[in-house]
Regions:
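Patatin-like phospholipase
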Residues: 1-53, 61-274
Length: 274
């Protein structure tokens, strides 16, 4: 009986492994995701789905819309921080920045505008401001979803979608591993771009807000990362959430971390699923 079962299993066609990429949040440290994607592309490995939170959703949207690693690098190098900031008057608004500039930047540079039309399935994670529940956007305007996923409370104004208000996805899923599984991933490669809390400088209002956000998300992130099949954690110590000037260092850190993890990923991809 056992031999017959084994013979039947051997004859059963095996489907391709569905690799899911979960890109975590971390503001300016998100440039590290570009380095990770460079190494994957050089190795001939393409994820079958990508889910992003906050900064991870920015890179995820560009990548799934069809931009290759070289194009992502070029976009990263040319990105002007001032083009992403639209300051408001904090005392009379619900955030230091509106967030319109980020949405405009995404719209101008995305090859595909709708989430459901992306070349690779895309998921964008945000948080319902009033219920505290998570939302996985798999349809709709990509720029608006990314803006919502990146709306750090008190830094960016909440984003209205379908009559509800949404803020940063990092409140519920700093690294969206479970959402990659929800979308059907057999294997989840998680990229954690958080930095040791003690290594982050908090010497300005924006830095203090982002550091507070990092503290809130640490335990949740640690819990979720346990569900990943492989975690890539670039060495980003000393690179603050607002350190756009460190983009080259962040990209290189992503390359180094993914290169080290590549042999283990290749082993995981040799698994077979019925």
């Amino acid at each position: 009986m056992q031999e017959e079962s084994e013979r039947r299993d051997a004859l059963t066609p095996k489907r391709p492994i569905k690799l899911g990429l979960a890109l975590g949040g971390g503001a300016a440290r998100g440039f590290a995701h570009v380095g990770v994607l460079q190494v994957l592309e050089e190795a001939g490995i393409q994820p079958q789905l990508v889910v992003g939170t906050s900064a991870g959703s920015v890179v995820a949207a560009f990548y799934t819309s069809g931009k290759n690693a070289s194009q992502l690098l070029k976009l990263s190098e040319s990105m002007d921080e001032s083009a992403l900031t639209d300051w408001t008057v904090p005392l009379i608004s619900r955030g230091m920045m509106r967030g319109d500039a980020l949405a405009k930047y995404m719209t101008q540079n995305l090859d595909i505008k709708k989430i459901e039309e992306m070349k690779i399935p895309l998921g964008v994670v945000a948080t319902d401001l009033h219920s505290g529940e998570s939302i996985l956007f798999q349809r709709g305007d990509a720029a608006t979803a990314v803006r919502a996923s990146s709306a750090v409370p008190a830094v960016f104004q909440p984003v209205q979608i379908g009559g509800k208000e949404y803020v940063d996805g990092g409140l519920v899923a700093p690294v969206p591993v479970r959402f990659a599984k929800q979308m059907g991933a057999d294997i989840v490669l998680a990229v954690d771009i958080s930095a040791p809390l003690e290594a982050n400088k908090a010497d300005g209002m924006l830095q203090i807000l982002l550091q507070t956000f990092s503290i809130m998300g640490k335990s949740l992130s640690d819990f979720e990362l346990k569900e990943a099949d492989l975690v890539v954690k670039p060495a980003l110590s000393g690179i603050g959430s607002a350190a756009f000037s460190e983009r080259k260092r962040s990209i290189e850190a992503g390359r180094v971390a993914m290169t080290k993890a590549l042999p283990q990923l290749k082993i995981l991809l040799q698994k077979q699923f019925p």
